[in-house]
Amino acid sequence: MDVNPTLLFLKVPAQNAISTTFPYTGDPPYSHGTGTGYTMDTVNRTHQYSEKGKWTTNTETGAPQLNPIDGPLPEDNEPSGYAQTDCVLEAMAFLEESHPGIFENSCLETMEVVQQTRVDKLTQGRQTYDWTLNRNQPAATALANTIEVFRSNGLTANESGRLIDFLKDVMESMDKEEMEITTHFQRKRRVRDNMTKKMVTQRTIGKKKQRVNKRSYLIRALTLNTMTKDAERGKLKRRAIATPGMQIRGFVYFVETLARSICEKLEQSGLPVGGNEKKAKLANVVRKMMTNSQDTELSFTITGDNTKWNENQNPRMFLAMITYITKNQPEWFRNILSIAPIMFSNKMARLGKGYMFESKRMKLRTQIPAEMLASIDLKYFNESTRKKIEKIRPLLIDGTASLSPGMMMGMFNMLSTVLGVSILNLGQKKYTKTTYWWDGLQSSDDFALIVNAPNHEGIQAGVDRFYRTCKLVGINMSKKKSYINRTGTFEFTSFFYRYGFVANFSMELPSFGVSGINESADMSIGVTVIKNNMINNDLGPATAQMALQLFIKDYRYTYRCHRGDTQIQTRRSFELKKLWEQTRSKAGLLVSDGGPNLYNIRNLHIPEVCLKWELMDEDYQGRLCNPLNPFVSHKEIESVNNAVVMPAHGPAKSMEYDAVATTHSWIPKRNRSILNTSQRGILEDEQMYQKCCNLFEKFFPSSSYRRPVGISSMVEAMVSRARIDARVDFESGRIKKEEFAEIMKICSTIEELRRQK
């Protein structure tokens, strides 16, 4: 039978059908190959938007830099980065006037954070540009490498463990005439394999010392590595994103802390809150505007889109904002906050891996690294690439491009939101001094603008004034992509508002399904996602019940754990059938052991082990929750774990789920193929680092170490802790005299070894 799809929607209000138009089912597009082309696009576009600025040369690195600030007044419709300093400062002043004490209070809050933050704050985050190896690394490894190099170059302030002291080292490192770094390299040699008697290539990993002069070091310290943004839906072209190195990260963190503190106090800011809290905040602003537009006034809302937000922002503008926000604050505080924007106005963009060439005729492939783009003959490239390279050449130094204007994606979300809100703030009647007025919402580059006026001409005048005011601070509202509606219907950060927020359920679709962590976590995450969507996203009971059944089915296929009495044959069915037959209480078996599903929409909040505990055979309980089971590498039991779920839009969200550690909570082992690559040395460092941290945590359960006091090494701290614990255990009779003596002896030996070293 043919179903006419429009019939499905006859009973559905139009706004509820919005989510069916979203491109959110199926796999998102991923990028392949190098991001070099996208990065060159970004660099070239950014310079084009600011082309009428002044060119200067950085005296330290020799990099050419373009400064568009206070450039020509912008022209209509063309995006441009010519922000006017005095306008930005005035917007800040008015923002402060409307919110007395806001900057002062935020500065005090931030000052406290600055003095207390530990350097391990920087280990959060994923890939980070590691300047010592000139490539991306996990954040913790990149930080460890940086600190190691700092210490071997006599920079030791970081040993206090405070982030601010690590940043002192960063500042000092920039004054050094040269830095000595350790890099990894690999040697290949051909040897005969004893077993097979064939020749094989053996790789050995070495570490070598290398000296870097001041200019090269500065270039590395100011470099942002670039990658292609993956999994972006609804776009034809990919785009580049940046990952900064450890020198920049700490400074950015403090600036964003200050800006976050300000955003929390601004009712128009869509950051840093999210989810339902954000919806409530938005609904308030809308309510205010609709209440005030009595019968005499019209109210219209623009669903706004800004053209190339990041590429028209300017670090110099952020410096002006910070200078204003921190006026009257202590000198050290103002200095530390102004370093991030200064580093960004001298930033370099690393062009990535370069280009791959292949000759079909000769079956040859070769990679042209980014470093060669400055000198290679352009006849090998197609026309569009040739144009890109010609344009970028004057900016190239050692495979990186000088990129003074522009901000790169996602670096100063909070601070740029403050700038956006400061323009929304100017819409009050006391500032517009006429019959129209505006208010709105801002979240990074996304905005919604609500304009009220007595008639249509007034609305038009209000929108024009807003548009022109934005231009003065380097914000370019796109006239093509923004649209206006009677207030009551608009979209903001993928929330659809129609006299209240409409659940956009399709956004959550990608997070339904089996995550692939392990049997225990996957079951827990799966039901938690369904529970959360019932709470937040209008997932009705019938649909939720269906989602649950589909999830269980998916789960059973993933882990091949069909019910013990099923006819389906899989690799596991022999074992599971045997278990099923010898189990008295079959309802007590977990789904992953071939048991029945006892979940329904009323008990989704209970972990499966707890749900079935009373129903389990005793010996099954013993096997399931046995910390001595040799096949399980147990993590310590945390009652709540965090899973990363992928909503369709925006970054991966962290979602809490209840974790009960059982024999199903295994941790998969690392892929072995990494052991044969140049990453091996890094992997060994990482494991070493991990082992030390694990050992340290064994001595200090998380409740007892918050902020280390004084400067003692990890080893000293552990030895003294071991002595104290041993004495307590001995005196309370928990350990024998011989054991106590042995512990004391080991402690003395460790101290002796440290002294000899």
From Swiss-Prot:
Swiss-Prot/TrEMBL GO biological process terms: DNA-templated transcription; symbiont-mediated suppression of host gene expression; symbiont-mediated suppression of host mRNA transcription via inhibition of RNA polymerase II activity; viral RNA genome replication; viral transcription
Gene3D superfamilies (alphabetical): 6.10.140.720
Catalytic activity as recorded in UniProt: RNA(n) + a ribonucleoside 5'-triphosphate = RNA(n+1) + diphosphate
Motif (Nuclear localization signal): 187-195, 203-216
Keywords: Eukaryotic host gene expression shutoff by virus, Eukaryotic host transcription shutoff by virus, Host cytoplasm, Host gene expression shutoff by virus, Host nucleus, Host-virus interaction, Inhibition of host RNA polymerase II by virus, Nucleotide-binding, Nucleotidyltransferase, Phosphoprotein, RNA-directed RNA polymerase, Transferase, Viral RNA replication, Viral transcription
Enzyme class of the recorded protein, top EC level: transferase
Region (Disordered): 50-82
Start and end residues of each stretch annotated as Promoter-binding site: 249-256
EC number, UniProt record: 2.7.7.48
Subcellular location: Host nucleus; Host cytoplasm
Compositionally biased tracts (Polar residues): 55-64
Single GO MF descriptor: RNA-directed RNA polymerase activity
RdRp catalytic domain mapped to chain residues: 286-483
Function: RNA-dependent RNA polymerase which is responsible for replication and transcription of virus RNA segments. The transcription of viral mRNAs occurs by a unique mechanism called cap-snatching. 5' methylated caps of cellular mRNAs are cleaved after 10-13 nucleotides by PA. In turn, these short capped RNAs are used as primers by PB1 for transcription of viral mRNAs. During virus replication, PB1 initiates RNA synthesis and copy vRNA into complementary RNA (cRNA) which in turn serves as a template for the production of more vRNAs.
Family label: Belongs to the influenza viruses polymerase PB1 family.
Subunit structure: Influenza RNA polymerase is composed of three subunits: PB1, PB2 and PA. Interacts (via N-terminus) with PA (via C-terminus). Interacts (via C-terminus) with PB2 (via N-terminus); this interaction is essential for transcription initiation.
Protein name in the entry: RNA-directed RNA polymerase catalytic subunit
Native organism: Influenza A virus (strain A/Memphis/101/1972 H3N2)
